[in-house]
């Protein structure tokens, strides 16, 4: 099977799976007018926060977005840890209501009702920081780039999932701000698909061999089992 897949074909197969089977909205990066120095999909971010936090005023939402875009100084790992706290527990903000200061949390994701969230898959999403890079595939939830996928050609002997891992590490150096918002990194060459975090060494990236709790009894799970099992919206 791998012999019939070029890297471009494989990328298209992954995009098609996420779009048609899992229901992610598909966008082609160059078609989106945006600031290439921002890793966020800002056209989706504010409407998503409004939808999830219906009772909060715009001042609270704009402060949350400001905090998402302006992290205090620290290492990439420290910033990622702050973001993960925001993602899981909400962004603490203050706003004024009838002259009285109030404190609240702005939630980034609706974990109780997945249908309230907007899931987007993009390719050719340019981001400029230390240099200009375009990761193969990015998965956004409510405009936040939570997943970065690096694919390698399954038909080229000189490239494999390890090459994808090295590319991910290069991205962390060249476009570190993209990884502030990262929850999962994926490296895949069709035969082998593994997921990890920004702190994972290559040996800590793990396969995912189930879509429903029943594991594939094979050395390597098929790529569709991996992506469906890991990125189905209810996960």
Residue ranges and their predicted role:
Residues 2-235:
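ATP-dependent helicase/translocase motor core
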């Amino acid at each position: 099977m791998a012999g019939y897949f070029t890297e471009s074909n494989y990328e298209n197969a992954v995009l098609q799976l996420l779009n048609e089977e899992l229901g992610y909205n598909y966008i082609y990066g160059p078609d989106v007018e945006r600031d290439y120095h921002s890793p966020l999909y800002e056209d989706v971010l504010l409407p998503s926060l409004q939808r999830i936090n219906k009772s909060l005023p715009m001042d609270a939402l704009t402060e949350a977005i400001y905090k998402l875009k302006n992290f205090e100084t620290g290492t990439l790992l420290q910033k990622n840890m702050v973001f993960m706290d925001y993602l899981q527990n909400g962004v603490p903000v203050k706003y004024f209501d009838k002259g009285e200061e109030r404190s609240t949390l702005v939630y980034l994701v609706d974990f109780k009702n997945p249908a309230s969230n907007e899931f987007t898959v993009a390719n050719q999403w340019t981001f400029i920081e230390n240099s200009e890079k375009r990761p193969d595939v990015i998965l956004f939830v409510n405009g936040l780039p939570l997943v970065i996928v690096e694919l390698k050609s399954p038909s080229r002997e000189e490239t494999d999932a390890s090459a994808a891992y090295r590319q991910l590490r290069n991205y962390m150096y060249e476009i570190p701000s993209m990884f502030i918002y990262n929850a999962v990194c994926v490296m895949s060459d069709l035969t082998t698909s593994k997921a990890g975090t920004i702190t994972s060494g290559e040996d800590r990236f793990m396969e995912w061999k189930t879509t429903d709790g029943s594991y594939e009894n094979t050395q390597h799970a098929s790529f569709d089992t991996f992506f469906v099992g890991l990125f189905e919206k209810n996960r």
